[in-house]
């Protein structure tokens, strides 16, 4: 069970996130303003650099902050969800969190359309998130829910999928993520087989179709489709696996990690040109939670 327990996360404190690939996060801000009109209001946004983003919000529009957070702070970034495979998926998650009444993924939860009477803006946002993490396609992503401010930590009303993590601690972007592609350390060479270990057919266009194990000592060579079907053996009705065991060495595999390894082996350059572009109005969209009407008693 992945339901939150403060004692569980106490041993999962992390002061940095050292990922080999990209960092895409969707965060929740809470206003600490002394002005009662703004105090407690919330903001949902997307970022690739949480430390820089909260600084921009608190400095204001002239320094890259959003119009709707300007002069309504100071703001705290209380939590962030990360582990999205790319910025597109993260932005879709952000939009649904901002607009639960418009998201087709959340149409089975009409109670999310309005903030309840006497419910705080944070509690409303947290209630939306709790439901989102149990809905496809997000419930099949290897997401991490990270608490950034311990005063806001609380249990989820529903158990999260087992492959998701709940941790606490600040986020910093590691140097390896900021390294230019031409400075990147290449992964060790792989001794590929000429045939797929699952279908026993020859690997045609291996650069496009081939996947291997994340265990560097394992020589697993498979077509992407073959390995996906193998990992989906116990999950009929799905097309993209969450993970499973390697058919050769029985290493526990994450589908997201397999695809990331494939990109590294191919030398696909990281899309660093987008890493500092979370400042535009198209990306930095307010959730308008402060104007959300309440349900009557």
Swiss-Prot record:
InterPro entries: GIY-YIG_endonuc (IPR000305), GIY-YIG_endonuc_sf (IPR035901), Slx1 (IPR027520), SLX1_C (IPR048749), SLX1_endonuclease (IPR050381), Znf_RING/FYVE/PHD (IPR013083). Its EC number is 3.1.-.-. GO terms for cellular component: Slx1-Slx4 complex. The keyword Phosphoprotein does not apply. It is found in: Nucleus. One of its GO terms (molecular function) is zinc ion binding. Residues 275-297 are annotated as: Disordered. Transmembrane segments: none annotated. A zinc finger (SLX1-type) spans 196-249. It comes from the Eukaryota. The keyword tRNA processing does not apply. Keywords: DNA damage, DNA recombination, DNA repair, Endonuclease, Hydrolase, Metal-binding, Nuclease, Nucleus, Zinc, Zinc-finger. Its cofactor is a divalent metal cation. Residues 22-108 form the GIY-YIG domain. Belongs to the SLX1 family. Forms a heterodimer with mus312/SLX4. Catalytic subunit of a heterodimeric structure-specific endonuclease that resolves DNA secondary structures generated during DNA repair and recombination. Has endonuclease activity towards branched DNA substrates, introducing single-strand cuts in duplex DNA close to junctions with ss-DNA. HAMAP family: Endonuc_su_Slx1. This is Structure-specific endonuclease subunit SLX1 homolog. The lineage of its organism: Eukaryota, Metazoa, Ecdysozoa, Arthropoda, Hexapoda.
């Amino acid at each position: 069970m992945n339901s939150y327990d403060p004692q569980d996360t106490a041993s999962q404190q992390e002061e940095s996130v050292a990922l080999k690939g990209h960092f895409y996060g969707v965060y929740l801000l809470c206003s600490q303003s002394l002005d009662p009109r703004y105090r407690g209001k919330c903001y949902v946004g997307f970022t690739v650099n949480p430390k820089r983003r909260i600084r921009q919000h608190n400095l204001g529009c002239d320094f890259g902050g959003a119009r709707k957070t300007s002069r309504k702070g100071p703001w705290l970034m209380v939590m962030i969800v990360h582990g999205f495979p790319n910025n597109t998926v993260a932005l879709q998650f952000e939009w649904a969190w901002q607009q639960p009444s418009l998201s087709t993924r959340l149409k089975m939860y009409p109670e999310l359309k309005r903030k309840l009477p006497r419910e705080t803006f944070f509690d409303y946002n947290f209630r939306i998130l709790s439901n989102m993490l149990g809905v496809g396609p997000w419930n099949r992503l290897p997401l991490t829910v990270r608490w950034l401010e311990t005063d806001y930590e609380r249990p989820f009303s529903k158990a999260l999928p087992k492959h998701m993590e709940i941790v606490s601690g600040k986020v910093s972007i590691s140097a390896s993520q900021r390294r230019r592609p031409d400075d990147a350390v290449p992964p060790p060479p792989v001794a590929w087989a000429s045939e797929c270990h699952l279908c026993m057919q020859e690997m045609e266009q291996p650069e496009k179709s081939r996947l291997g194990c994340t265990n560097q000592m394992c020589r697993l060579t498979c077509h992407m489709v073959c390995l996906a079907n193998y990992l989906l053996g116990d999950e009929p009705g799905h097309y993209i696996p969450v993970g499973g065991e390697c058919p050769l060495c029985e290493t526990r595999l994450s589908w997201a990690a397999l695809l990331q390894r494939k990109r590294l082996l191919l030398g696909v350059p990281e899309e660093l040109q987008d890493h500092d572009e979370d400042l535009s109005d198209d990306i930095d969209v307010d959730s308008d939670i402060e104007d959300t009407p309440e349900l009557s008693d």
